[in-house]
Amino acid sequence: MTLDNYFSELTDPEIVIKHSGLLQLSGLAGPEIIELLGLWSTIPTERRREIVDRMTELVEDNLDLDFASVFRACLRDKDDQVRAKAARGLEDSDDRTIIRPLIDLLLKDDSLEVRASAAVSLGKFAVMAQDGKVLKRDGERIRVALMEVIDRDDESLETRRRAIESVASFDSPQVEQIIKEAYDDGNPELKQSAIYAMGQSSDSAWMPIVIQETQSSDPAIRYEAATACGNLGEEDTVPHVIALLNDDDSLVQLASVRALGAIGGSLSKRALQQCLLMGDDAVEEAAKNALQEIEFDADPMGFSAES
């Protein structure tokens, strides 16, 4: 099927949207994206939502797909759900041209869902800014925008907590204080975000708190603590993460497996090999991926496989 024919199908609400068809929207550029935009407003709202939702699912399963041009165009959609889904779809994008549109949504959009999604997607660029992979002025714009919404008294909790998670990559006493205040706030959701932020900061000074929270009675907190251990990458956390492999909550178990893959080391590797024998398909699959991550980190060029 030609791209023109598929565009026509998208506008027809009687035709079922299939993942196989949406693959044709990957990598659109130039005249192709202009043509799609010309038809976009004729597509019913519910169908536009479904299209963007399906593309987001596809990207999560296959990082080789590139719907960034479509997602970026949808940031201007008149429907707030489409804008929010599009902003979230850009979470893993490193296209620097979307920094300003995301900042505009974060600071100015009327929808709290859109603002929160924009805050999440700016997190990737915050990391890039700290690594010197974006212009300094863009990094500063990101930091200032995130700090602004965190400081707003009338901002939604969801937007503030996502902004805290994203701003954590910036190394400064002010950011450290924000994380501490969120942790001590008493709100369970803010505490979850604070623990995630501790890991995102890559500051080992947070390690004692993160380790302590692996024993929390709240599974959501244990999940974030496991994730934070993985992001901190400190081998001292490994025994505490291993203890979570037998957690009653399956999501905590999976977070622990991923964390061990991120931390690496011989102890993590042995624990993950034991996970292959647990008889849980999800845990076994996650453990295989984690072991591959450890092997790649140890031998990124694949030299050992050639010897």
What role is predicted for each listed range?
Residues M1-F7, L28-W40, D61-R76, D95-K108, ...:
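Amphipathic alpha-helical scaffolding segments comprising HEAT/armadillo-like alpha-solenoid repeats
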Residues N5-Y6, E14-L22, I33:
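Eukaryotic low-complexity, mixed-charge intrinsically disordered interaction/regulatory segments enriched
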Residues F7-I15, S41, T45-D53, S117-M128:
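HEAT-repeat alpha-solenoid elements in large eukaryotic scaffold proteins
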Residues I15-V16, T45-R49, D80-Q81, R96, ...:
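Alpha-helix N-cap/helix-start positions at coil->helix boundaries
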Residues V16-H19, R49, D53, S69, ...:
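Alpha-solenoid HEAT/ARM repeat scaffold
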Residues D53, R88, D104, V120, ...:
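Residue-level signature of alpha-solenoid helical repeat scaffolds
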Residues T56, E91, G123-V127, A168, ...:
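Structural signature of alpha-helical solenoid repeat scaffolds
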Residues G230, S250-A305:
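Long, ordered, amphipathic alpha-helical scaffolds
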